[in-house]
Amino acid sequence: MADLVTYSNADHNLEQALITLKKGTQLLKYGRKGKPKFYPFRLSSDEKSLIWISSSGEKRLKLASVSKIVPGQRTAVFQRYLRPEKDYLSFSLLYNGKKKSLDLICKDKVEAEIWIGGLKTLISTGQGGRSKIDGWSGGGLSVDASRELTSSSPSSSSASASRGHSSPGTPFNIDPITSPKSAEPEVPPTDSEKSHVALDNKNMQTKVSGSDGFRVSVSSAQSSSSHGSAADDSDALGDVYIWGEVICDNVVKVGIDKNASYLTTRTDVLVPKPLESNIVLDVHQIACGVRHAAFVTRQGEIFTWGEESGGRLGHGIGKDVFHPRLVESLTATSSVDFVACGEFHTCAVTLAGELYTWGDGTHNVGLLGHGSDISHWIPKRIAGSLEGLHVASVSCGPWHTALITSYGRLFTFGDGTFGVLGHGDKETVQYPREVESLSGLRTIAVSCGVWHTAAVVEIIVTQSNSSSVSSGKLFTWGDGDKNRLGHGDKDPRLKPTCVPALIDYNFHKIACGHSLTVGLTTSGQVFTMGSTVYGQLGNLQTDGKLPCLVEDKLASEFVEEISCGAYHVAALTSRNEVYTWGKGANGRLGHGDLEDRKVPTIVEALKDRHVKYIACGSNYTAAICLHKWVSGAEQSQCSTCRLAFGFTRKRHNCYNCGLVHCHSCSSKKAFRAALAPSAGRLYRVCDSCYVKLSKVSEINDTNRRNSAVPRLSGENRDRLDKSEIRLAKFGTSNMDLIKQLDSKAAKQGKKTDTFSLGRNSQLPSLLQLKDAVQSNIGDMRRATPKLAQAPSGISSRSVSPFSRRSSPPRSATPMPSTSGLYFPVGIADNMKKTNEILNQEIVKLRTQVDSLTQKCEFQEVELQNSVKKTQEALALAEEESAKSRAAKEAIKSLIAQLKDVAEKLPPGESVKLACLQNGLDQNGFHFPEENGFHPSRSESMTSSISSVAPFDFAFANASWSNLQSPKQTPRASERNSNAYPADPRLSSSGSVISERIEPFQFQNNSDNGSSQTGVNNTNQVEAEWIEQYEPGVYITLVALHDGTRDLRRVRFSRRRFGEHQAETWWSENREKVYEKYNVRVSEKSTASQTHRDRDEEEEDIPH
């Protein structure tokens, strides 16, 4: 059941309680036959009857016939299945002259208080203010304002009720709570954090049930909203449904305790789910921002929730809020009528026409309209230019705000970039300023986009029959990019400009997105303009340059409401159906997936709901549905899968929420179900409740592990040992006494509200020591056992969640007394010191754990990065290796092909292919470039050859001759350089390699003058190249124009040949060389002397 939010106004609190009763809940009903069963109970709209749906149909109990309300399990019907542990959650309504009773058990303590207090108020009012609650002194449930309200969780709500003589007119009076200010986000309460309930003669405390303390922002339970008659709409309550990217109460802690920061997570809700609130609300209007939302109830109260940033929630505290929370500072002074949310601020309009703003003002001087960049954490009224004006509505963009007065005057303020304020310039306005170009005209609607604004302005139109009527025309201004202004171009407009393409239509509502504008005519037609991305225009044929009509499924519908998110649109028709289209990320369209929709598509999950209002946030959507009570037909089908019960599909009740489910949807069991007879046994729960209870169990286990006795340091261990020695003398008897009390309480199986941890100054220390020894602090705080017999033997009295007078002896319940317990003062002091030591050790160990965890996370990230880099390097190496292998194979193949071609040439055929395309000759040598410079690979090859062949030897054709003189070398070099261009295929490759290499060589100096002349004649030389005959032997050949070849020189490697070895080799292999290369041989081929020319060697060999 929902928790109470406290107010200072008694009428508000009474109305809040009645709203809760009208919405109803699942209660466990006892009968005269059979076992107890779950039924939905609610209060009728006229507040005169109590209605529930049983297996035989709807039943009613008129409150006028109820003569008495009896808390506890005292009737004979309860005795059939007595559950003492649920005594404080039970009550009975006696009617028909106390002859019959309606016996019920509530889910938790707060729910019981609301039902008992609300029914008591109605019965007392109906019977002249005479109280009918047994044991109550005629007063209602009220609050002692002088007492301090306590809570064990930041998000919990507590109330203190006093048993006094309050007037019947104000029976349900609860004071507001001031939550502690903290920079940490609001952490959901857990089962281990439930405060112990202390009862005395004057006060009691209420706390949210542990089973409901851990909640997600949206509920998985199906709502009972459905279509109803128009006559009931005024009395129906408003439920909020929400879908898209929604804030979740799973908080992630980053860093160690000293520098810890908290990250609030968000979850994607793909279909509409009812918003789960800590209170039961009647929502009238809702507004959605980027990371927060707000709504206004029918009672004029404003609630906000979401991620806190600069005070935009208005609670005055710097922490996130997961469930709607009352903005107390504004509700206490004014009744709110309208609310709007921007990205960093929030605006609210009261019934008195006052405008309040709050939020982060540091982003822009004029964002809040107060003339400064100061952030306001609570609502602040805007005066100045609005003094004396009645504000009717307001619209918020990320950086500017627009408002309309009751007389239709339009004011804007904030950042004026792109002329978004409509004042004819781009200046920032710090206070609300009227748009002068629309002065004298009545503005009926306005909407703020990111950098553009749109408004509907009434224009007097003269008809053909000379009559004048007012018609709403669409005006836009600001940034014209993406055609969002609808003027057919992308130019900005600094002042409001009427959209000419829509001049013939009568508009009355407008909405703006990021790059989108949507208008609604009085005839129910929807026009869109702007970017076509994600299909947000809802028309497949448009290019977005001009406004287009949204038809398709809306062609036969009458649209009543429209709303825009950043990139999606929602429309509400007259048949209360919701259509959405545009971007589908995060499930913001509500169709159960993440797909975009380019045409309007109905939201099936809301098809059987009566929707009365819609609102879009940046990436989520919300709707207000009229709440209708569960019908008999809905009781005959599963609350989750909506399938009807039958012979094979049996119905089961969830022991946590009480709703009916089939076996498939409630096949799991869990401990600590709210409506379970025993918390220590497994009971059937639905799937959604199982998830919630599992989370609570996990948190409890974590808390138990954290509360275990830590390993002590040396200094603290010595201190603890000394304390144990002092306690050993007399501590045994006291611990035995506590164990005996626990064993008796376990047999009795009851909980007490009077055995409080805060009642006696000595008992808390004993209990704390016991918790430290048993490593079970959380369990001890959650359930302090009730004793069956008081040690002092005093007379027992009844115990109930409400403080009241003694009941008759027959219904008395034993209560413990602490008067018989006595412990020396030294024990309490020693246990306090021990507890402090343990707490210090826990803090140290937690700090170490957080530090090590953080280091481990960093190292894991670094390891992942290293592995990723290694994989990338291996992939790159493998790729390069594959390329290298392929290149080598290609080279080998080309060389083999070239050799085959050379072998096939007939004798005497000139060789035309002196080099390959890649610059390699047949033997793999690289030719230099045309400019005389060699490539790097050629240079390396040339250098290698030069290093192994440093000697030059000259020879005559078929004979040895004198070496060339040094002065002949330049001529030979010149001759060689001039011979190469004769072949066009060699001209691109430059001179041959022999120009740079003049190693151990023989020159062909034939005595045949004609032969020598033929070689030296540059006109007869066609090509020259070098070939390797065998390792260490390099042959220089010349191709002549007549098709013959001549041998120019032979070079030998110094590493393989000496001077005489080279001469010997040549004399032995000369004929073979001539025969192999088909070189003409001179008739005079006698060898001549050979000598070594050192000067030529030094000149030709490169250094």
Curated annotation (Swiss-Prot):
The gene coding this protein: PRAF1
CDD domains: FYVE_like_SF, PH_PLC_plant-like
ZnF bounds (FYVE-type): 632-694
Residues covered by the BRX domain: 1023-1078
Domain called PH: residue spans: 22-123
Function: Binds to phosphatidic acid and to phosphoinositides such as PtdIns3P, PtdIns(3,4)P(2), PtdIns(3,4,5)P(3) and PtdIns(4,5)P(2). Catalyzes guanine nucleotide exchange on specific Rab proteins.
UniProt organism field: Arabidopsis thaliana (Mouse-ear cress)
Chain positions recorded as Zn(2+) 2 binding sites: C654, C657, C686, C689
Biased composition (Polar residues): 962-979
Region (Disordered) residue spans: 144-233, 783-818, 962-988, 1079-1103
Keywords of this entry: Coiled coil, Guanine-nucleotide releasing factor, Lipid-binding, Metal-binding, Repeat, Zinc, Zinc-finger
Pfam families: BRX, BRX_N, FYVE, PH_12, WD40_RLD
Presence of the UniProt keyword Zinc-finger in the record: yes
RCC1 repeats: 237-298, 299-351, 353-406, 407-458, 471-522, 524-574, 575-626
Coiled-coil residue spans: 828-904
Positions of Zn(2+) 1 binding: C638, C641, C662, C665
Tissue specificity annotation: Mostly expressed in flowers, and, to a lower extent, in stems, leaves, siliques, seeds.
Domain of life: Eukaryota
Name of this chain's protein: PH, RCC1 and FYVE domains-containing protein 1
GO terms assigned for molecular function: guanyl-nucleotide exchange factor activity; phosphatidic acid binding; phosphatidylinositol binding; zinc ion binding
Low complexity biased stretches: 151-169, 217-231, 791-818
